[in-house]
Amino acid sequence: FNGPLTTDLINIGYNLWFPVMFFILYWQAFTFKNPCLRLKFFYSFILCWIINGVLLATIFSSVGPCFYERAGFLPLDAYSELMARLNAFTESRPIWALSTQDSLWRNYLNSETGLGSGISAMPSMHVSIAFLMMLLGFSQENKFLKVFLCLFFILILIGSVHLAWHYAVDGYLSI
């Protein structure tokens, strides 16, 4: 996973999280094939945000590796090799995670609040929702959808660590 091509693929895949999530939400909002499953999905989706995104994020307030050095944690160079490698890759192609991380850190320093402006690492909502979407995929007859959502979950789990958003344990707790 150390090469620029792999990082590019992970970067693109990780940034597809919002479109995939919105597609799944839209699909579930307008499908009437299995109303019981649909209701379970939406209840689970809401509970993921309440339990993981509010309750556990407050209890386990933390910052990911991308903010580790900026926040002044010791040793200061614990994740500098990872960040240096990601920054070296971005010289030839943009890694969107890095510019987003810079923007989030500026928001934090300026005490700006708003939707999507937090830097909490544990638990990972990307991993939590990707896992929920994978479970939904397992309930479908469409094999492509099952495989896609399973691979997408794995990509998000790996990408959250590879792109320095999260520690591995953040993703495990999210599940």
Pin down the residues of each PLM region:
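Membrane-helix interface segments
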Residues: 34-38, 141-151
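Interfacial helix-loop-helix junctions of multi-pass membrane proteins
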Residues: 62-69, 121, 155-175
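Membrane-interfacial alpha-helical segments at the cytosolic side of multi-pass membrane proteins
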Residues: 23-30, 127-145, 175
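Divalent metal-coordination and catalytic microenvironments
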Residues: 18, 41, 61, 126, ...
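Aromatic-anchored segments of alpha-helical transmembrane domains
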Residues: 49-55, 151-162
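N-terminal transmembrane-helix/juxtamembrane module of multi-pass inner/ER membrane proteins
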Residues: 1-23, 31, 60
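Interfacial segments of alpha-helical transmembrane regions
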Residues: 22, 26-60, 66-78, 82-83
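Membrane-interfacial catalytic/cofactor-binding modules of polytopic membrane enzymes
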Residues: 59-139
